[in-house]
Amino acid sequence: MQQDLLHRYLFDNLDVRGELVQIENAYNEMIANHNYPDAVKALLGELLVATCLLTATLKFEGEIAVQLQGDGPVKYAVINGDDKQNMRGIARLQSEVTGSTVKELIGQGYMVITITPTKGERYQGIVPLEHETLSECIEAYFEQSEQLKTRLWFATDTTEGNAKACGLFLQVLPVDKQKSIEDFAHLEALSHTIKDEELLELDANTVLTRLYHEDNPRVFEPQSIQFKCGCTREKTMTALVNIGQQALLDDVAEHGEIKISCHYCLKDYLFDEQDVKNIFN
């Protein structure tokens, strides 16, 4: 498998477009040291792949957040990214995890997709989580927001240190409606034959050739995907300002230093008395 790449492809004679995502390094970095249950790791892997696919599909410059939130064992799971495919993600648990489907993990809730473009107005789409799988929830989003037939297939391997998350995406092109429906049905039937182990182990060209060898997919230059947290000492200092100097000094006096941990990458930022004074000077 070629690591951490998004491949977009079209078919010369079919009104359908597709994407294939295969992620290893960025996924392992995202879940490392968080001690998530395997079901939560898998959910975050699927959500990571979905966010990469959405970022490429919706064609914007800026930032995106895809969040699942509800009343289930997983209070929320969120992936933050941008059009350069810089991604980070986190999940928060509020009770013991016993199931593995979206319904069992999130419970009654919503999927919230927020796009903050570099230029233009912020967009937010909210979709009730009415399906068992994340792929069905994403498909429902496209049916609701863009009225475009869409299908997704996800595969994850949560092996410690060797985790992988992959996804396959098909969507009709808004050209000739009847032809698009027929083309989509043809490619959907072919795509249904994909096995999880093929998505997880084979390189993109092999996967696409096996699936669509008679339809000649035209594959574009791949886009790399990377884990990028974005936390910095400077951003942490800005957050501390809101607490107030005296409260921070009192905390230092009691504990010797202030330790702020990034929720995403778990990096610790330490501040002593002089650091606190420097923040307010």
UniProtKB/Swiss-Prot annotation:
Signal peptide: none annotated. Disulfide bonds join 229-231, 262-265. One of its GO terms (biological process) is protein refolding. It comes from the Bacteria. InterPro entries: Heat_shock_Hsp33, Heat_shock_Hsp33_C, Heat_shock_Hsp33_N, Hsp33_helix_hairpin_bin_dom_sf. The keyword Cytoplasm applies. Keywords: Chaperone, Cytoplasm, Disulfide bond, Redox-active center, Zinc. Under oxidizing conditions two disulfide bonds are formed involving the reactive cysteines. Under reducing conditions zinc is bound to the reactive cysteines and the protein is inactive. One of its GO terms (cellular component) is cytoplasm. It is found in: Cytoplasm. Redox regulated molecular chaperone. Protects both thermally unfolding and oxidatively damaged proteins from irreversible aggregation. Plays an important role in the bacterial defense system toward oxidative stress. HAMAP family: HslO. PANTHER family: 33 KDA CHAPERONIN. This is 33 kDa chaperonin. The lineage of its organism: Bacteria, Pseudomonadati, Pseudomonadota, Gammaproteobacteria, Alteromonadales.
